[in-house]
């Protein structure tokens, strides 16, 4: 599976940026009409893994991931105060759905994986986030019925250093972003909606872990 993911990256294929796109966006027959960067198209070739595929959602949209999808919201804490100082964010490829916006690393959940396992795998393959360097502390599941997206909350472990980087063409950049700067970024629509809730939850989890 990591090999397939690597090959997909070399081809510039994406699946993490497809989980929240509207009906027809980036589908072969409607790339030009569904993508604001219509002149920047992904390669025709594609590499699939079990779990890749479109789901017709009850919300009236199509989402990527037959088993749902998930991503890691990784935070760094001040070693003295315990407060959250940074989070890892993904600057999405220009040709992708909502290209040029910022979100979190993640993607479709493979057959046999839990959402957390899928998020850990995707974040390692896509963003160089090694599971050994982080601590999973919670999750939030947005459930649409036939499809769901799970945001996994995690902290960089004390004494460990995560050095995120873009491992494939799905991202222009993956980096640590100061927590106060997140709202100033051009966020993915779903992230813009959820960010106030996510930021508050990270603060709660950080305080609980620092007691």
Where does each model-flagged region fall?
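N-terminal leader/linker segments that precede catalytic domains of diphosphate-processing enzymes
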Residues: 1-12, 24-101, 107-160, 206-211
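NUDIX/MutT-family hydrolases
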Residues: 163-201
């Amino acid at each position: 599976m990591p090999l397939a993911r690597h090959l997909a990256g070399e081809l510039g294929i994406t699946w993490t940026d497809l989980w929240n796109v509207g009906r027809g966006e980036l589908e072969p027959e409607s790339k030009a009409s569904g993508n604001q960067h219509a002149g920047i198209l992904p390669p025709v070739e594609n590499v699939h893994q079990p779990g890749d595929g479109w789901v017709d959602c009850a919300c009236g949209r199509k989402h990527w991931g037959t088993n749902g999808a998930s991503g890691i919201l990784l935070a760094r804490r001040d070693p003295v105060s315990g407060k959250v100082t940074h989070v890892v964010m993904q600057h999405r490829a220009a040709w992708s759905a909502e290209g040029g916006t910022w979100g979190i690393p993640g993607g479709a959940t493979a057959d046999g994986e839990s959402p957390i396992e899928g998020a850990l795998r995707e974040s390692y393959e896509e963003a160089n986030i090694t599971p050994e360097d982080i601590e999973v502390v919670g999750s939030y599941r947005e459930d649409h019925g036939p499809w769901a997206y799970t945001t996994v909350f995690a902290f960089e472990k004390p004494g460990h250093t995560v050095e995120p980087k873009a491992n494939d063409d799905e991202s222009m950049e993956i980096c640590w972003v100061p927590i106060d700067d997140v709202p100033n970024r051009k966020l993915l629509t779903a992230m813009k909606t959820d960010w106030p809730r996510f930021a508050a939850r990270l603060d709660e989890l950080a305080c609980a872990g620092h007691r």
